[in-house]
Amino acid sequence: MAGHDVQYGKHRTRRSFSRIKEVLDLPNLIEIQTDSFQDFLDSGLKEVFEDVLPISNFTDTMELEFVGYEFKEPKYTLEEARIHDASYSAPIFVTFRLINKETGEIKTQEVFFGDFPIMTEMGTFIINGGERIIVSQLVRSPGVYFNDKVDKNGKVGYGSTVIPNRGAWLELETDSKDIAYTRIDRTRKIPFTTLVRALGFSGDDEIIDIFGDSELVRNTIEKDIHKNQSDSRTDEALKEIYERLRPGEPKTADSSRSLLTARFFDARRYDLAAVGRYKINKKLNIKTRLLNQIIAENLIDSETGEILVEAGTEMTRSVIESIEEQLDGDLNKFVYTPNDYAVVTEPVILQKFKVVSPVDPDRVVTIVGNANPDDKVRALTPADILAEMSYFLNLAEGLGKVDDIDHLGNRRIRAVGELLANQFRIGLARMERNVRERMSVQDNDVLTPQQIINIRPVTAAVKEFFGSSQLSQFMDQHNPLSELSHKRRLSALGPGGLTRDRAGYEVRDVHYTHYGRMCPIETPEGPNIGLINNLSSFGHLNKYGFIQTPYRKVDRVIGRVTNEIVWLTADEEDEFTVAQANSKLNPDGTFAEEIVMGRHQGNNQEFPASQVDFVDVSPKQVVAVATACIPFLENDDSNRALMGANMQRQAVPLIDPKAPYVGTGMEYQAAHDSGAAVIAQHNGKVVFSDAERVEVRREDGSLDVYHITKFRRSNSGTAYNQRTLVKIGDIVEKGDFIADGPSMEKGEMALGQNPIVAYMTWEGYNFEDAVIMSERLVKEDVYTSVHLEEFESETRDTKLGPEEITREVPNVGEEALKDLDEMGIIRIGAEVKEGDILVGKVTPKGEKDLSAEERLLHAIFGDKSREVRDTSLRVPHGGDGIVRDVKIFTRANGDELQSGVNMLVRVYIAQKRKIKVGDKMAGRHGNKGVVSRIVPVEDMPYLPDGTPVDIMLNPLGVPSRMNIGQVMELHLGMAARNLGIHIATPVFDGATSEDLWETVREAGMDSDAKTVLYDGRTGEPFDNRVSVGVMYMIKLHHMVDDKLHARSVGPYSLVTQQPLGGKAQFGGQRFGEMEVWALEAYGASNVLQEILTYKSDDVNGRLKAYEAITKGKPIPKPGVPESFRVLVKELQSLGLDMRVLDEDDNEVELRDLDEGEDDDVMHVDDLEKAREKQAQETQDIAESTEDN
């Protein structure tokens, strides 16, 4: 027997074909959401408060300090929040201290700071009753970046940019004349020496002393001449910078100093964030810049005076490591004191080294480092600016390297916590202005924190973020996999990110640093390709928001692969060589071969085993969860795998789902972490179990109660239904499944079914990927799903009186009211069809249209039907089904309703949708198709043992698409069915062709895995043997019931009077310009005329035509289309005297819209009236015949 048995949870064993020992379990798959939010609660929120506070008033006599905060219990439980359309949020109370500096008086007070949405255990938020997800954003990391560009003459120039988290950009660039310029905040450029002089180093010699002598420096100094001798060089430089930043304003050195300080050196206005400081220190660090350079001076220890490194030594990694302590200490540190006119007058500490130029051995190049400012310094320092300039000048000398902006070391993730902190900061900053004004205006003695704090800006910022940010998305709830994928999604779009139109190929492309961090496969097709990605299965965020991936460390001394796990970011990995997970190892962990396949930076090649630093932990660490669910992924073309991964997320939960015979072993973990199942929180014993709740007695005697959700409507309209897995007496451990969620079976993800599939053509019905299906799949409800639709009706107060929910609906027969209760609301369990009343509702209508006689009769007989209009909630087109639930919300019951609403009724209708022609099906390899015919079981081809085939697919769908994985799955699936086992074939480590054939033999199948197939209609065998097997097929969310739509008459657009478009508006089919050409080509003038008139916007014509058709009379000639009248009116509005004349030169009168017509209704009413009139006439005729 090939393979070995592996247990997945307590309910499933699979035969696995994996050969690689996994040394690390998958992390919790939604930790990117939950950990980030937890960090926000633990420290992020506190940091935001500490950033903005304390706040002082303008005279500095009062100060408001932050003390701490506390979350109280949420107002609603999760379930109550869903039912009441509320948010699941907890009130936050913040303690402030108000200090009066004149009297020394301190007032401490707790202030309510609004309700803050809380993340559920599943990593989602409930906002206004809907489940939402905050998608993590992929953005450019703050830091310093260097780039090169080639001009039109082929000359290489360099550029550099310091990008903060918030604040002004500082750029450097060279031009074609070899002069270096700087730009502050995207303004006009100035020589870079001008900025150096503004920092207090004004002499030319001083500048050359700092940066060393080079052509770029000399050229720039020559360009930067002293124009105004009355000013010092520093003052002149400051004025020049001020002129660039504030053109047209009077320039003084003092205003320039304060402006530059505010732009770069004030921590409140300029923030690099922790990650920006880390990146700058890493880039400008002397150690990395000296690596592999030849030192041009003796390095002398300042304390002992000994020579650490002699001039002429190559600074290899080992040399640098030997003097690492001194490099981090005071080695070659110089203190430069700026002059008194400088922006920042504190001394500047720089680390300076001289190295031999790599281009010209006779030249010496100076390298200036920023002497590693402390991590807490979040603003820029003069040392940073000088070190950046030095790196930039060194690039022209052939030292240092330019940055690749698409490298994942330069892109980071802003997860939920950080996005929320940023929103909160925005709200607090708005509040700060408000607080400062109130502190200054009001009387100091009576002020309390409560009085001066207005929380509205903060709550508004948070509310706006959750409600309308591009990154706050309605959860994709088609199935557990789509939930999981959505929580792990990384978007480069959104505020502060890219835009679809500006993103080029480079940003979207797969980069070598994606390995183990972002999935190269799973991304949407279309305009967002490559901008929306998914976290790889082992991906994890570090404290700076860079994605790390785990590797097994290699002990290079003994050449053994250890089980020690090291998590590396992309730029850390660049320094090492990493071997693949399938490298052959001896039992003691040493490499079995001298040469192994590995990766170093962007190169995939063979390396000597002795050079390898790390080994991948798992073959599936490259791909995301959805991709890791595709068996035989290694045999599929990547474009089809992309479709396969995306289509699994569109699978509809079926009534009786089955886990795949051929899985990848990922199904258990995906189901477990998705949040859709019920998982045991503690060890214990089941003491009660039914379909709605399970009780578990813990070992310490306390009782855990788990509620099972039955048939709740999911965000996408499918049934969210959980099924209990345990029975009384079962022992459960923490993490065990208590109940399966939707699309799960026995604790594994089960998106579809395992039908018997044959690759063969049949009467041409599977042309172009169409799917032929057996009637068995319809009759036995194999692909049947339940869909729940929600309809609501509310009663409001109108000008003419309140609306009313009632059973007494005017002009409706008793038959239409048979399923309504005494209130006029449909009973639960009623079967409803299109047009049936769900909630009877009447709205008062004005009496302006009554004549005097009618009013008199009305007053005498009290005819109620005249006063009200029927506005009942009816079942829309395609909405028929069974009423599953009715919820009634009223103020009397204490429900919160919108202002003006007195009562709200929600009706849930369940539909059982069997698979039918036009539904979309797919396998897991991107092989998708539409059901084209459902064939009776007796007509389907059958196997030699009489088993009829379930599905027939076109064999032509395989070769050109190169997704051979489906054929391998087919054969292995048949073997698994015959053997009665389930199989796991993990990606890149699954069943080989030898394993496949061995399992086929074991299952007693023919040696070519094909079979003779008999025609169900004739009983004759087909000419050739056919590939028949079991393939996992899923039914997708694109169902024909949602798309098919037909209209006779319906709503019309107000201005053009043409039918609306689309199913949602019950619209017509657009007969466009090209379709008109087709009719013109055949001279079909009558058809063309009716399309442009009756069927479109000839208002009177269509009314008359309708009447003529219903009465059986000939159809009258058409009139003038409304859009022609609109054209005439538009031309008249331009002041043109436009008239329409007939052939006798008489003016044609166009009907006017405002001739007593009700123009606030789309003109369905005219047709409705005609219809009612017709019905009335028919009824009168029927009655008169009865009387006779």
UniProtKB/Swiss-Prot annotation:
Keyword Isomerase attached: no
Keyword Transferase attached: yes
Coiled-coil regions listed in the entry: none
Catalytic activity: RNA(n) + a ribonucleoside 5'-triphosphate = RNA(n+1) + diphosphate
GO BP field: DNA-templated transcription
Disulfide bonds: none
Enzyme Commission numbers on file: 2.7.7.6
Function of the molecule: DNA-dependent RNA polymerase catalyzes the transcription of DNA into RNA using the four ribonucleoside triphosphates as substrates.
Name recorded for this polypeptide: DNA-directed RNA polymerase subunit beta
Gene that specifies this protein: rpoB
